[in-house]
């Protein structure tokens, strides 16, 4: 689930943003945005000029200079407001997280075991390596790993999901997060971080923007904007001697107004807001990004590594068919398969019991009443089963059962090999059942491909993104599911080493790779990937290796993460196109007005037929300020984004924002000029 979305212009946030906008007028804050710093200097200069004119120290129209100065200050304030509003929305989201942090005491154990003597210490004094005991009703005081016990944990304060989760020692569910609450039982936890370094602390710092640094693309765009500003600054500086040589020197106020209207103030004023809003939108999807760089990288990704289970398929494989070996009755196979699954509580095991009941009316039997011994599945044996009387029944992967049969002096039948291949080609997973050394047949486990996933992959392909399915299945099963789902490639029988090698291979080809993971064995690959989304339900090692954490622990979220990243890049590109395009329209307003007296031929450029030179210049400056406010919703919400090829996206961008950037200023400046004239303000 996602967190409650804030209204775009929440009244309390707007008021706070206005206050922050005024505070940001401090030159120490302004110089970080070079384009708007030039506007700030121009505002200060024209303010001094208008005061000097009003006092008679300088000749000129004091009222006109004051109006220009006022609107230049408004331009700076609007740019500050856009950034402050974006930051305010992020801080509001962070405040909801701060409520989770509670000053509490923890029971620090003197020995790493349940029942050991404990000391009551403030939670904020716990250090990495300390052992604590938490029981039902307690708030977990630190991030850590469960070393003993198991408990139901309410993580809704972090994830927004109301359903409790089980945390227990061992495996991939041993990681706990400080600030979550124990609902039942108890846990002995080893703290994995020092104070101020918890997941919650990092989340708050990231969301508040305290650690926000400019991304590479943002830096490159800033350099471009600075270069354009320097060019226009030099060009404007040379205009004064030209006009003076013509016998009618242009005033400094007009030159400052010209400079401000020519430099890319629109994108300059909104650039920071776009970056902050991108991270905020990611949080709206319940994904915490460690930096803007991670969000930006998501927009540039061109290879997605997707786990099959839970991402491409529903993840709950169900027994669909019993396929007996030659000379074996199907009911005999079903009976043995059901016996081997009686104590198997996995979805697959339960489905085998149910299928045998449905097909042959075989009732469930109690393992204890049968005086049987259940053999659990392990990663080493890759099979499970039951020992009952003199019968030894096992079910498991083909390779595991083959080794088991051969170890017991038996022979794996060729016809079963054929049946295994047949099941795998159909996209199902084959489990082989054996009694003693005699192979009884194959169980087909069918996993269902998610509806609509093939269409989503087609959209990603259209965008130039390659999809690769990662699965532990054999190559035949993987190939069948890959074909059904519509992915571009697959990695079968995947191991952590194989994932890491595949990522490095794609990166060596100059591609950017995104993946998800939740286990400690995923950590090396997550650390190597350009965009690494760790599941919040995963281990501490996985979360530390990734550069994003999905609070919903939903592997499918990776596609949404890429969408948000591309939307941020699209928004930045769209507003840059619009900003540069609307500068062209402003040339036709200001240049004829500023120099018509010196060079009458320039009147031919006054295609908007503006009322007077003063109204033309003032209208352009007013429009230049107002357009920032009108574009704030676009900067915060993001430009509309559709899965298109790069060339189609460029054409769409140029038509909407390029042509729009040309037309909107012509209309806006003309309307403002008419209003100023009608109201008698010029």
Curated annotation (Swiss-Prot):
* GO CC list: plasma membrane
Which residues catalyse the reaction?
307
Q: Binding of ATP: at which residues? A: 344, 348, 377-384, 395
Q: Quickly give the catalysed reaction.
A: K(+)(out) + ATP + H2O = K(+)(in) + ADP + phosphate + H(+)
Q: Which Pfam families match?
A: E1-E2_ATPase, Hydrolase
Q: How does it sit in the membrane?
A: Multi-pass membrane protein
The chain's coiled-coil residues are: none
Q: Which residues form the signal peptide?
A: none
Task: Drop me one GO molecular function for this one.
Answer: ATP binding
**TM segment ranges:** 34-54, 62-82, 219-239, 254-274, 588-608, 616-636, 656-676
Q: Which UniProt keywords apply?
A: ATP-binding, Cell inner membrane, Cell membrane, Ion transport, Magnesium, Membrane, Metal-binding, Nucleotide-binding, Phosphoprotein, Potassium, Potassium transport, Translocase, Transmembrane, Transmembrane helix, Transport
Q: Which residues bind Mg(2+)?
A: 518, 522
Record localization: Cell inner membrane
Q: Give the family per the record.
A: Belongs to the cation transport ATPase (P-type) (TC 3.A.3) family. Type IA subfamily.
| NCBIfam families according to UniProt | ATPase_P-type (TIGR01494), kdpB (TIGR01497)
Q: What does this protein do?
A: Part of the high-affinity ATP-driven potassium transport (or Kdp) system, which catalyzes the hydrolysis of ATP coupled with the electrogenic transport of potassium into the cytoplasm. This subunit is responsible for energy coupling to the transport system and for the release of the potassium ions to the cytoplasm.
Complex formation: The system is composed of three essential subunits: KdpA, KdpB and KdpC.
Spell out the protein name for this chain: Potassium-transporting ATPase ATP-binding subunit
Protein's organism: Escherichia coli (strain SMS-3-5 / SECEC)
Q: Which gene encodes it?
A: kdpB
């Amino acid at each position: 689930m996602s967190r409650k979305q804030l209204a775009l212009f929440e009244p309390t946030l707007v008021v706070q943003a206005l206050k922050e906008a005024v505070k940001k007028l401090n030159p120490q804050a302004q110089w970080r945005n070079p384009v708007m710093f030039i506007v700030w200097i121009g505002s200060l200069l024209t303010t001094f000029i208008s005061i000097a004119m009003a006092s008679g120290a300088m000749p000129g129209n004091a009222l006109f200079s004051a109006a220009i100065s006022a609107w230049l200050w408004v331009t700076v304030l609007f740019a500050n407001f856009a950034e402050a509003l974006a930051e305010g929305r992020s801080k509001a989201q962070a405040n909801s997280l701060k409520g989770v942090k509670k000053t509490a005491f923890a029971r620090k154990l003197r020995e790493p075991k349940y029942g050991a003597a404990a000391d009551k210490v403030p939670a904020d004094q716990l250090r990495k390596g300390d052992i604590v005991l938490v029981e039902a009703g307690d708030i977990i005081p630190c991030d850590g790993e469960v070393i003993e016990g198991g408990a139901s944990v309410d993580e809704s304060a972090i994830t927004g999901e109301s359903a409790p989760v089980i945390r227990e020692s061992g495996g991939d569910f041993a990681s706990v997060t400080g600030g979550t609450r124990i609902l039942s039982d108890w846990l002995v936890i080893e703290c994995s971080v020092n104070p101020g370094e918890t997941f919650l602390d990092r989340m708050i710092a990231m969301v508040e923007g305290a650690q926000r640094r400019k991304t590479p693309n943002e830096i490159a765009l800033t350099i471009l904007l600075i270069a354009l500003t320097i060019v226009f600054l030099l060009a404007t500086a040379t205009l004064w001697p030209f006009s003076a040589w013509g016998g009618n020197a242009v005033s400094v106020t007009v030159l400052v107004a010209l400079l401000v209207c020519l430099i890319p103030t629109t994108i300059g004023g909104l650039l920071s807001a776009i970056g902050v809003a991108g991270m905020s939108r990611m949080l709206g999807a319940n994904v915490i990004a460690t930096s803007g760089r991670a969000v930006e990288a998501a927009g540039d990704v061109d290879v997605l590594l997707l786990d099959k289970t839970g991402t491409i398929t529903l993840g709950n494989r169900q027994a669909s068919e019993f396929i007996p070996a030659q000379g074996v009755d199907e009911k005999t196979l079903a009976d043995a398969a059901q016996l081997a699954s009686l104590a198997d509580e996995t979805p697959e095991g339960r489905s085998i019991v149910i299928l045998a009941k449905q097909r042959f009316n075989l009732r469930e039997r109690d393992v204890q009443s049968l005086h049987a011994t259940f053999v659990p599945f392990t990663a080493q044996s890759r099979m499970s089963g039951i020992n009952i009387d003199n019968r030894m029944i096992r079910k498991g992967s083909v390779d595991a059962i083959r080794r088991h049969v051969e170890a017991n002096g038996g022979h794996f039948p060729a016809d079963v090999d054929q049946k295994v291949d047949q099941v795998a080609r159909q996209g199902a997973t084959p489990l082989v059942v054996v009694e003693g050394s005699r192979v009884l047949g194959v169980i087909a486990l069918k996993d269902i491909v998610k509806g609509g996933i093939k269409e989503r992959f087609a959209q990603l392909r259209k965008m130039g993104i390659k999809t690769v399915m990662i699965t532990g299945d054999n190559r035949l099963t993987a190939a069948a599911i890959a074909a059904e789902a519509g992915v571009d490639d697959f990695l079968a029988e995947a191991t952590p080493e194989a994932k890491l090698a595949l990522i490095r291979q794609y990166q060596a080809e100059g591609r950017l790779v995104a993946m998800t993971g939740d286990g400690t064995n995923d950590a090396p690959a997550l650390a190597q990937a350009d965009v690494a989304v760790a599941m919040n339900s995963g281990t501490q090692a996985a979360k530390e290796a990734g550069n994003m954490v999905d609070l919903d622990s939903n592997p499918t979220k990776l596609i949404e993460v890429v969408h948000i990243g591309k939307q941020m890049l699209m928004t930045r590109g769209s507003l840059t196109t619009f900003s540069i395009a609307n500068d062209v329209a402003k040339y036709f307003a200001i240049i004829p007005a500023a120099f018509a007296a010196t060079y009458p031929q320039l009147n031919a450029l006054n295609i908007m037929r503006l009322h007077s030179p003063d109204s033309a210049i003032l209208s352009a400056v007013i429009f230049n300020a107002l357009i920032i406010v009108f574009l704030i919703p676009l900067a915060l919400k993001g430009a509309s984004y559709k899965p298109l090829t790069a060339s189609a996206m460029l054409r769409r961008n140029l038509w909407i924002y390029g042509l729009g950037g040309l037309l909107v200023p012509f209309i806006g400046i003309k309307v403002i000029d008419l209003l100023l004239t009608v109201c008698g303000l010029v």
